[in-house]
Amino acid sequence: FSTRTGAGIAALRDHLEEACRRALALADNSFHPDMRYFRQYMEMRLQQCRVLSRLAGSLQRLGPECRPFPWQADEIGIFFEEVAASLHEYNNALELLERLEEHRHRFKLSELPASRREFETRAVLYEAADSLQHLLELKRDFVRALTPSQIETFWACPMRPRGGKKGTKTGRI
C-alpha cells in the first residue's frame, strides 16, 4: 500500500503499543479491580489496527486499471466513512454489523460481473468487507466481555456520545 498510508498505520500501531504499555502500568499501580479495562481496550484497538493494515493492503490492489469502479465500491466506501465517524469507544458496533450485512445482501442480489476486471475488483471489495466485518466484530466482542462493573465505571461517563439508551443497539451494552 502507499507509503503515506503505511506510515500512518505504523505510527498508529506505535501509539497503540505505547498506550497498551501505559494501560498495563496503570492497572499494575491501581487498587481498583477493573482497571484492566484500559489495557483490554487498547489491545482491542491494536488488533483493529492490524486489520486496518491488511485492509489497506487489499485496497491498494484497486489501481487505476480497475476503473471505472462498480457501484459496490461507492457504497462500501461511503459505509467505511460512516464507520470511521461512528465507531467511538462507547459504540458496541451491533448496528454497524447489521448495516454491513444489509450491504452484503444487496451485493449478493446484484448481477454477476460482466468482465474479469470487474470480477477481480469486486473480489477485492468483498475481501475489504470481510476485513471491516472483522474490525467491527472485535469491537462487539470487546463490549460483550465487559463486566457490569466496567460498564458502570467506564461507560457511565457524562461525556459519552449521545445516540442510545442502555440496552439498545447503539447504547452501552
Residue ranges with predicted function:
Residues 1-38:
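Non-transmembrane accessory domains of multi-pass membrane transporters/channels
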Residues 36-159, 173:
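Soluble C-terminal extramembrane regulatory/interaction domains of multi-pass membrane proteins
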Residues 160-164:
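Short, low-complexity, intrinsically disordered N-terminal modules
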Residues 165-170:
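Polybasic, lysine-rich low-complexity intrinsically disordered segments
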